[in-house]
Amino acid sequence: MIRIKDIPQVALRTALFALLKDGQSCDVFGDVPERAALPYITLGAMTFRPVGNKTAVIWQATAGIEVWADGNQQQEMNDILNDICVLFSYYGADLEIEGYHIIGTELESVETWPESVTGYHGTVTVQFTLQKGKVQQ
């Protein structure tokens, strides 16, 4: 078994945050300000599972991209979720994730539901297979 020295959580978060900031017209927050105007996007839960072999550190990672909207913004939320899926399908495989190479990407799921505090909540879950270092060509 190869020794794991880091988890690509910060690098993946940074790359996703940059993609969303550049590709969305609504606000994207790491830490949501107290009186933030809806709708907005946050990065949600992430999971990392090592799937490497004897010679490579490989991670299977999922990331939740959260959209929050008020009770009158269901259509806006759906439009934002759609835009996120388009962004990911066009640019997800080309993200620069510091210290890692993207082996594969997949749009895993899109979910929406009424939310008691804000009005509506949606999540896009994306999946990455990441290999430590540069892949030999």
What are the roles of these predicted feature ranges?
Residues M1-D31, A45-Q137:
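Charged, amphipathic alpha-helical segments and their flanking helix caps
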Residues E34-R35:
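Short, charge-patterned binding micro-sites
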Residues L38-M46:
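Low-complexity, acidic Ser/Thr/Pro/Gly-rich terminal tails and inter-domain linkers that flank the onset
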